[in-house]
Curated annotation (Swiss-Prot):
Biased composition (Acidic residues): 77-87
PANTHER family named among the record's database cross-references: GPALPP MOTIFS-CONTAINING PROTEIN 1
Spans annotated as Disordered: 19-133, 147-214, 226-277
Cross-referenced InterPro entries: DUF3752, GPAM1-like
Protein name per Swiss-Prot or TrEMBL: Uncharacterized protein F26A3.7
Comp. bias regions, Polar residues: 88-101
Basic and acidic residues composition-biased segments: 41-52, 147-161, 236-268
Length: 297
């Protein structure tokens, strides 16, 4: 509907033809109203040529043409597949993961290993693997037992630098700038001893000293035993008298009967008795003289 005066029909036909020509023009072309400066309007063929030049003018690295065509075929699989057959195995850059690639038709569900939510408890041992399973189980039990024992016997222990003095002490530039006048002082490690270490060390020293003293006493006793004299004269006399009593057949202190030959025996000199008396007197000098065999008391 239109209000107001309208153009005649013959003029409307010319306007319709101009609109059809404008529709045939390229979309996006600038519409010009009014007079135009000569040379400003660009021909259609030159404009298309300029657009092609803009499309081909690329700055920096560009994707090869065959790769670009292949990517276009992936995005539009319904297009020509001849180029895909020409370059079936060529790929540039990182490949698309398989789960992002378009799939055609039904697909097999993926496997997630042997795990299943329906399995409850350990799986039964395969036939023929009973011995291997028993060995593995025994080995695991031994390892578990050793780990438990180590955990029970574990005792916390401080590191060495926390319990001992450094072997080499330095003043770190804070000492006197003179030569040392005395000997180098030794490191005092007595304060590092544990409560029972000092007592144990003293006992070991005492036991070693006692062993040395006992050995020295044994050597002195052997020397004294070699140098000491034998039994005294009284002991020798008593021993001989006891032997005579045993030979007579009577015990010591026992009363023996009267014997005429022994009791009435004349104590005078017998023939040849003088020589025997002289020999017996010679023995007196040996008894009261110094001993020849035993020179030490």
């Amino acid at each position: 509907m239109s209000y107001g005066p309208q153009l005649p029909a013959f003029l409307m036909k010319g306007q319709i033809k101009e609109n059809e020509v404008d529709d045939e023009a390229e979309e996006g072309a600038p519409q010009v109203y009014g007079p135009v400066i000569p040379g400003m309007e660009e021909p259609k063929n030159e404009k298309e040529k300029h657009d092609d030049q803009e499309e081909t003018s690329v700055f920096g690295p560009s994707i090869p043409k065959e790769v670009r065509e292949k990517l276009q075929n992936v995005e539009n699989p319904a297009e020509d597949d001849e180029e895909d057959e020409e370059f079936p195995s060529q790929s540039y850059g990182p490949s698309i993961p398989s789960n992002f690639r378009p799939t055609v038709g039904p697909s097999i569900p993926g496997t997630f290993g042997d795990d299943s939510d329906e399995d409850i408890g350990p799986m039964p041992v395969a036939k023929g693997d009973e011995e291997k399973e028993a060995i593995d189980r025994a080995y695991r039990m031994v390892l578990q037992k050793e780990a438990e024992d180590d955990e029970k016997n574990f005792q916390p222990k401080r590191e060495e630098w926390m319990t001992s003095v450094p072997k080499k002490l330095g003043n770190f530039g804070l000492g006197a700038r003179t030569f040392k006048k005395g000997t180098t002082s030794e490191r005092d490690a007595s304060w590092e001893d544990a409560p029972g270490a000092k007592k144990r060390r003293n006992e070991e020293t005492r036991s070693a000293r006692s062993v040395g003293i006992a050995a020295a006493d044994a050597r002195q006793a052997a020397i004294v035993a070699e140098k000491t004299s034998g039994p005294s004269l009284l002991e020798i006399h008593q021993k001989k008298r006891d032997e005579k009593v045993k030979d007579a057949g009577y015990a010591q202190g026992e009363r023996r009967p009267f014997d005429r030959e022994k009791d009435m025996e004349v104590r005078g000199l017998k023939p040849g008795g003088s020589k025997e008396a002289v020999d017996r007197m010679k023995e007196f000098a040996d008894r009261f003289a110094n001993s020849k065999d035993q020179r030490f008391l």
